[in-house]
Amino acid sequence: LRLAGVSEFVLLELEDTPGGNSRGGMVGGLPCPQGAHYLPLPGDDAREVQDLLEELGLRRRVSGRWQYDEQFLCHSPQERLFIGGAWQDGLLPVQGVGDATLAQYRRFARLVATQTNAARFAMPALTLWDAQHPMAPSHRALDAVTFAAWRAEQGLDDPHLRWYLDYCCRDDYGAGAHRVSAWAGIHYFASRHGFHAPGEPID
């Protein structure tokens, strides 16, 4: 806000200390997170985020390219899931799932790609629209139904996929697929790197 020239504002915090799910604490004298929220490396549409990271000293230009402070980067595998009595890399259940589940993963990947090709998704989303460029009709249709309803309409009823999509909604939006719009659910993937079914090539 300050960089945008806004000087009069009030920041409200629900808790006694600021930070939300990015707040940290101390355990046995060692700093640790109490929650976790990570930023994907910002793309060209997220200029305000880029500026903030630069102001915080988390990125700088080296030989004409942006370089991020390695101390603050998370490297793969970033997340793991305990399923079927064992750990697997990533949160999408793949270990021990059947062919029908994998087929639904591939179908969802195609649906996300179709929506991405129909109209652009970006992060932050507000960079997409203005009075001359309103939300695309295909996006408005998605925004009019819940992600759960859209998923059901598409025949995506596999319990592993349903769990994963609901988790993604709760993680990013604080509400499950029955409360989040289909546009928001698809935006979770389309504004990043899409959705890639296991075993499928990544462009």
Describe each model-derived feature in a short phrase.
Residues G19-G20, G35, G174:
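Glycine-centered flexibility sites
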Residues S7, G57-R59, G155-P159:
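Short coil/loop linkers at secondary-structure junctions
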Residues L30-A118:
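Dinucleotide-binding Rossmann-like beta1-alpha1 core, especially the glycine-rich loop
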Residues R2-V27:
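Glycine-rich FAD pyrophosphate-binding loop
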Residues D16-T17, W87-Q88, C169-D171:
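Short, solvent-exposed loop/turn segments at secondary-structure junctions
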Residues N117, M123-D203:
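Active-site/ligand-binding neighborhood in enzyme catalytic cores
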Residues L3, R47-D51, A149:
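Solvent-exposed, polar/charged alpha-helical surfaces in well-ordered, non-transmembrane soluble domains
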